[in-house]
Amino acid sequence: MEPVKVTLCAYCTECPEVEITDRGVTIGEDENTVRLTHAEWNELVGLIKRGELREI
């Protein structure tokens, strides 16, 4: 799997990033990060797509 890295803000380099690798998904910045397995990430994406998680 080719790693994917996306910043949550296109206007600066200080915002959290989402990094997807063969080992899992990391969301955050510096020490403020959460690590998800691929299964956990897929569940999160599914919840969003099904409308169970929405903008706040």
State what each model feature region is.
Residues 1-56:
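Positively charged, low-complexity terminal tracts
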